[in-house]
A protein has these predicted regions:
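Catalytic Zn2+-binding segment of zinc metalloproteases
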Residues: 128, 138-155
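Acidic/histidine metal-binding catalytic segments
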Residues: 72, 92-95, 150-158, 176-178, ...
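Hydrophobic or amphipathic, alpha-helical segments that drive membrane association/targeting
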Residues: 2-8, 13-107, 229-234, 292-295, ...
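Short pre-active-site segment immediately N-terminal to the catalytic Zn-binding motif
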Residues: 115-132, 193-196
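Active-site recognition of the HExxH zinc-binding catalytic motif
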Residues: 116, 132-140, 144, 201
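Extracytoplasmic and endomembrane cell-envelope/extracellular-matrix remodeling and assembly machinery
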Residues: 31-32, 36-43, 54, 66, ...
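Membrane-active amphipathic alpha-helices enriched in small hydrophobic residues
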Residues: 158-173, 177-188
Length: 482
């Protein structure tokens, strides 16, 4: 396939995905609607919806690049969990993903799967603005817009929803053909309901946002800035406004609702600033000089938190491009100036580790782990350093203890797979890898890893039985084939 053809295929696939997500977030209902802004619907995720969610994410992984950085994924998940605390129902089923894309977008997919694009994080100016978008998506989930849309489609015998989902699942040119075959009157019919669902998600999103301690005004600040930037650009609306249409009526409704909430100044969030610069440093386009330039003009900022974050971004960029000596120097300066900040201690340890100073990194992280026993991220970095130092048994113990406290953290299992593999325990390595795949909604790959693990087991009846049982459990989750 030529470069041009690949580019067109990607653009077509993304168009399919964007249109489908717009439909997911807006359509009619055959269920009884909850009162506007009510939390009574709550989070309800049936086994069928969970299965669809797994299929959806597995298919999305073929079209999009998912971020696997433990610090960034923990930040997005923690923000989502903070916002969902005021909701009722099965909030444990909520899953948050971070996608590496410059598009300003976020979506709520089936099975309470929610995705945030890195372009959205870097486009927002405060954590409250980012939280306002996630709160809006939680509003879609709490009001069960996707299940209501699908039920209405079934009752009206409209194949659009299933075909649009198939367009995502098939992907590429085949998916585009499936989308095109059903994107006529049925799509227009369902989009007529988008406005009502956006209204519900706006109203409920404001409640979710303010219940989590954020100012409601952040919602309109972000929407108006996006709208203004759209008018000044010739490239069209950001993806978020294409999937969440912004009309004057919608702006007026949000503004009228905001007046019901007390306004206050949001204290700046260092975690948010760190997340933004981490995205720019680790995933920004261009060479070292180009990426470093993103932070240079912030170093003399009168906003202390902005200057701090810029220094952090510099260190991350230097590590990314292999300038470890300079990274260690700047990270040490940051740690000296702000000794209480865990992020700076982690980035110093990372610079030491990448430069080959493994024992220094282990010593540094061991001290930090003792001071922050509840931190999953610190435990992850400590276990990783122990593995690279060849201390596999200690690394395994750290991971086992951390997994007991955070059993749904996929990256712990991925690291455990590496530790077991380095230690020569191949069946256990593939067993841990299967858990990682499962938590990433890649059930087929999880089954494959377990099947491979079963071929490596010898003289261990308990382990073999455990693997066989898990294979059966996962096979039961697979969609039945016609």
């Amino acid at each position: 396939m030529t470069r041009v053809a690949r580019h067109l295929t990607l653009k077509t696939s993304m168009a399919c995905l964007s249109l489908s997500l717009a439909l997911f977030c807006g359509a009619g209902s055959a269920e009884q609607d909850s009162p506007l802004g009510s939390l009574q619907s709550g989070i309800v995720t049936s086994p069928e919806e969970q299965a669809m969610g797994r299929e959806f994410i597995a298919a999305a992984r073929k079209q999009l690049v998912f971020i696997d950085d433990p610090l960034l994924t923990e930040y997005v998940s923690a923000l989502g969990q903070r916002l969902s605390r005021g909701l009722v129902g099965d909030t444990d089923s909520l899953r948050f993903f971070l996608i590496n894309s410059p598009m300003v977008n976020a979506f709520a997919g089936p099975g309470s799967r929610m995705a945030v694009f890195t372009g959205l994080v870097t486009a927002t100016q405060t954590e409250a603005e980012l939280a306002s978008v996630i709160a809006h998506e939680l509003g879609h989930v709490a009001q069960r817009h996707l299940p209501r849309m699908m039920e209405r489609s079934r009752q009206r015998k409209l194949p659009t929803t299933a075909a649009m989902l198939a367009g995502i699942l098939l992907g590429g040119q085949v998916g585009a053909a499936a989308m095109a075959a059903t994107s006529g009157a049925a799509v227009a019919d369902q989009l007529n309901y988008n406005r009502e669902y956006e209204r519900e998600a706006d109203v409920l999103g404001l409640r979710i946002l303010t219940d989590a301690g954020y100012p409601a005004s952040a919602t309109i600040q972000f929407l108006k800035r996006l709208d203004q930037e759209t008018r000044l650009q010739s490239s069209g609306a950001p993806e978020y406004l294409r999937t969440h249409p912004l009309t004057q009526n919608r702006i007026a409704l949000v503004e009228s609702r905001i007046r019901q909430y007390p306004d206050f100044a949001e204290p700046p969030s260092l975690d948010f600033y760190h997340a933004r610069v981490r995205i720019q440093a680790l995933y920004g386009a261009g060479g070292a000089d180009s990426v470093l330039a993103n932070f240079t003009h912030h170093l003399d900022s009168t906003v202390t938190i902005d200057a701090r974050a810029a220094r952090y971004g510099q260190v991350l960029t230097l590590i990314r491009f292999g300038n470890y000596d300079e990274a260690i120097k700047l990270a040490s300066d940051l740690h000296r100036d702000f000794p209480e900040d865990v992020s700076y201690r982690l980035v110093l340890a990372d610079a030491l580790l990448q430069s080959g100073q493994v024992e220094d990194a282990v010593s540094h992280l061991e001290t930090l782990a003792l001071e922050t026993p509840e931190s999953t991220v610190v435990a992850y970095y400590f276990a990783d350093a122990l593995m690279k130092a060849g201390r596999f048994e200690v690394s395994r113990k750290v991971l086992r203890r951390t997994i007991r406290a955070a059993p749904s953290n996929a990256f712990l299992y991925r690291l455990m797979a590496r530790v077991e593999g380095e230690a020569g325990n191949l069946p256990q390595s593939f067993q841990a890898l299967a858990e990682f795949y499962f938590l990433q909604d890649e059930v087929s790959r999880a089954i494959g890893a377990l099947q491979h693990a079963s071929t490596l087991v010898s003289d261990n009846a308990y382990l073999e039985a455990s693997i066989t049982s898990k294979i059966s459990e996962l096979e039961a989750l697979q969609p039945s084939k016609p």
